[in-house]
Each structure stands twice: as structure tokens, then as C-alpha cells.
Amino acid sequence: MTATTTLKSFNYLSLINHRLNHNSYAILSSPLLPRSHPASTSFSNSGFRFFQSNHLFSSQSGSLMEVFKAAFSEASNSCDRIAIKADGKSYSYGQLTSSALRISKLFLKDDTTNGGQETKKYEGFGSLKGARIGIVAKPSAEFVAGVLGTWFSGGVAVPLALSYPEAELLHVMNDSDISLLLSTEDHSETMKTIAAKSGARFHLIPPVVNSTSETVACNQFQDDSFEAEGKFLDDPALIVYTSGTTGKPKGVVHTHNSINSQVRMLTEAWEYTSADHFLHCLPLHHVHGLFNALFAPLYARSLVEFLPKFSVSGIWRRWRESYPVNDEKTNDSITVFTGVPTMYTRLIQGYEAMDKEMQDSSAFAARKLRLMMSGSSALPRPVMHQWESITGHRLLERYGMTEFVMAMSNPLRGARNAGTVGKPLPGVEAKIKEDENDANGVGEICVKSPSLFKEYWNLPEVTKESFTEDGYFKTGDAGRVDEDGYYVILGRNSADIMKVGGYKLSALEIESTLLEHPTVAECCVLGLTDNDYGEAVTAIIIAESAAKKRREDESKPVITLEELCGWAKDKLAPYKLPTRLLIWESLPRNAMGKVNKKELKKSLENQE
């Protein structure tokens, strides 16, 4: 059987809406795919299983940029609405827009500096169309204003991590050919030096005035203030670099179109509204922190409160402040929190270290939040269950990548199945490209979405190779679909799938099981080269502190391989049991809590 569909053009994210039936597949038109992909395609279901959302995304009017443009309408109620809270200060949508326009107008002036070095040339407002603008700032109103100012000027925002070492910053700046680097006063000296080394200009982001120090007249700017060149929908707007866990970081180019479609999709799926108040403690150079916790909330006119960095005590305290035990909700109560699994592990550890009274007030407060989500890496079942027992929240797991942001989610309302990432979001199509030798329906997950990236920066061949002939993005993740139609992620084909004695094993499945052991606080499983079996299941364990102390007091090792396998033999098939065990103090994680297994495996094998 062959299904044929035509991709029709659409204007400003007007999505195709038609009914799905048993023998038709709805494909969203998308100018976001690389231009090498045809507008009309046919595909066969040979070797594939097809799945799609039960309904298509119903677009709302407007875009993220128009939210801020509306802040300057006389009839708008958004101008004075608080958009950002940071460092004890509040910033309205109007003040953010005013600052962004001020930044865009600075590009008109030739008053930037790069320390006297020769620079890459640009000519200001309008001619910034397509120019890459690096932004280095802590989570703040200034960061948001820097991104918006870049977009108002037709530029492409490239968020850079404060945690990057100089060599990595220079690599990203040179790879993306950044012509202007924006930063704040607290990082100015370092960033001036780096800008000079890369040949980019440097400019300070002007401080954003806060809501108590200045009131913005909502009608002070004319509409033509927003009419800079470059805001065409399919123009590049954002380059986010991949984390590099499976190879060299690549620049992923998103357009205004893909950004708009994604924020609308998330707003609808998770019911973000202007009544929501987000507590944000994620990095802003990854899509989780950018889209789920910033762009989509701002599109919904929510309030985003930045914590300068992840703090166990700070998060529990902020929740308790929001919902005191006397049940009197405050005016600025947190309603939504999203984090990575490692954060929830640390929050559980912090909770367990509290006295009984503090535990009661903390659990009471956490239960009052509307929504808690987890992503960026697999959520171990024990963590999900323990969090639910403490807070009453079954964490909402979803599935995303830099290339398409979010594609699947457990439902906001309905069964959230542990160990799964739910079903495709409205407007997203997914399929499993099955391995011919696998009888369990396991294969590579492929995705088509209106939020798909445009291309990998300066890597046309890699971009082309990343798509199937019918325009689906090949994620590189192995997965299957369970009996409820929910997707189960088994891990990266290159890092989490081990080949042991003829079996293909999921490291994530084994990790999730080992984490149920009371001695195991964290764990990483990977396959190390083995002459007899191809790869050996190797477990790296970080012990739970109390269990570790107890065993040390007894002059015993924290845990032995025999003890671990003896405990796990009733939970895992014999060929899935670890044959090697390493006890470490900590795991090397990146800013999103991920372990670079490819590099870790290489390092361990080089030591042998």
C-alpha cells in the first residue's frame, strides 16, 4: 500500500486542517524543510509503521513577535503586564519591547568597538538581515531584550553559554560567523577579548528599566518602528548549537516560522495562559530553556521568573513562598515548573534532608502548582514515582530535540504513562523506521513537524542526509510504540543501544531498573568493547550517601557486582545484567544534565 500526499503552501502558519481516517495521513505544509526536499512526495509503508496525532494543531492568530508589537497598541492590555522577574525586579512587556527597539536602533550607529582590531563589517538597521548576532547574558530581561532587538533588526540570534570555555565560544562564534557580540556589563571584559579574537564587534546590552522605575507610554512608537527588513517568516531567526553528545556540535537554524509554530503548539498542548507564572532555572542556549520555559510562555503572555542558577533550597523556598501552609495564595505564586531529571533527583535529595515540618510545608506547596514537566533526558521510573509520592505530581514527560524542539508529549489531561514520552503533538507526524532484523517493532524514530529546523549551518550535505526521501527528519533515536500508542525512547542509536552477544539492548532500560536499587543514587550504563560478546554491559554507579556511609562503617564495599546482579536477576533478562561495575563519586554531565556517553566510552576504552 502506498499513501500519497501533497504539501500545500501556507501563509503565516495557516495550517492545513482536515480529518484523519484509517487510510490517510495529514502532512503539514512546511517551507522549513531544506530546499532539496520536493514539495510533493510519495512514500511507502514498507518497513515502516505510521503514527500520527488524533487531531491537528489549530493555529491561533498572531506570532511571538506580534505579542511584543501589541504591547505598544493603545488598546493593548499587555503593555504594563509583567513579562519577566529577575533579581527581585519586574519588567513589563512594554519595557522589554522598548529596550529591544533601543537595541535595534543601536545597530544604526557605528559606535561599537572590538578593541581596535579589524572587524567583520555590517551596516546597521535593515542590512542586518541574516547577520548572526551572538548573545551572552545570564537569564535576565537583558537576554530577552537582546534576542528581540536582534529580530527587530532582521538579524539571527545565536545564544551562547556562559559556561562555555573560551575555545568553545570561539569555535561557535567562528563557525556561525558572528559579526556582533552582545553582552552585559558583568561579562563585558571577557566578551570584549573574545570578540576581538573572533573579529566580531562588541556592544553592551543596555540595562532594561524595571516596572517600578519607568512607565512606558504604550502608544509612543509608530508601527513602522517594527518594519525593519528581515522579519520574513522563512528567514533564519535563531541558531542553537547541539550539545554534541553524539558528535561535534552543529548549528541548528530555526526560522520565524518554526519558532511561531512551536510556541503555538506548546501553548495549546499544555494550556499556557496569561495566568501562568513560570519558575525558570534552565540554560538559555538549549531549546528546553528557550522554547518550553521562555518563548512559549511569553507568547501566552505568562510571567517568567528567572532564578540565576539551579538551587535546590531556592526552588523549594520559592514554592513555599507561593503557597504558605495557611492556604493563602500569594499574588505572584508559581504555577508551572519544568526541569531535567537530574534536577528532580536533587530536589528529592533536598526534600529528604529537611526536618518533618519543612517537608510538610514543602510538599503542601508543591502540590499546588498547576503543572510540572521533565525532559532533555530520560526520566527514571523511580524518580517519577518518588516525586509523585512527595508532591502528588506525575511529571509530564515529552520528547524533543534541537532540530524540531518538541514533537511528542504525554497528555496534560489523561494518562501519563511512565517510561514513555506520549504521542505526537497536534500537527506533528512520526513514524518508526523498523530494523528488518528486529521482531519487536524497534527502529529509528522519524519526525515531520511545522517546527522543523531549516538546515544545519554551513552543512548542506549533513542536512540532506538527515532527512528521508519523503521529508521526515531522522532523529537517530531508537524507539518503539507501546500498546497504547505511546512512544518509548530506547536511546541514541550511537550511544544508548548496545550490541551484546547478538542482542540489541537499551542502556536506558537497564539504567532505569538499576536506579530502583536502594544503594544507587545515579547510574550510567554503556557498552564497552568485548572480544567475546561484542560489547559488555558496564554500569557506573554513584551511591546514595546514607547507604555509602553505612557500608563504609561496616568496612564493606558500597556494592559489589555480584550483589547488584543478584538483586537485578528477577528484573532483567540474564543477557541484560551488567558484567562490569564501576563506583564513582559523580558523573560528568553537561548543562542539561546529560552524560556524553560517546566521549565517556572512548575515555574508558583508552584506559584499558
Swiss-Prot record:
Induction per the UniProt record: By abscisic acid (ABA) and osmotic stress.
InterPro entries according to UniProt: AMP-bd_C, AMP-bd_C_sf, AMP-binding_CS, AMP-dep_synth/lig_dom, ANL_N_sf
Gene3D superfamilies linked to this entry: 3.30.300.30, N-terminal domain of ligase-like (3.40.50.12780)
Knockout or disruption consequences: Strong defects in growth and development and most of the plants die before flowering. Viable plants have a greatly reduced seed set with a low proportion of viable seed and accumulate malonate and succinate.
Compartment list: Cytoplasm; Nucleus
Keywords for the protein's UniProt record, in alphabetical order: Cytoplasm, Fatty acid metabolism, Ligase, Lipid metabolism, Nucleus
Main location: cytoplasm
Biological process terms in GO annotation: fatty acid biosynthetic process; malonate catabolic process
Pfam families the UniProt entry points to: AMP-binding (PF00501), AMP-binding_C (PF13193)
Tissue: Expressed in flowers.
pH dependence: Optimum pH is 6.5-8.0.
Miscellaneous comment: Plants overexpressing AAE13 show increased sensitivity to exogenous malonate.
Descriptive protein name: Malonate--CoA ligase
Lineage, opening ranks: Eukaryota, Viridiplantae, Streptophyta, Embryophyta, Tracheophyta
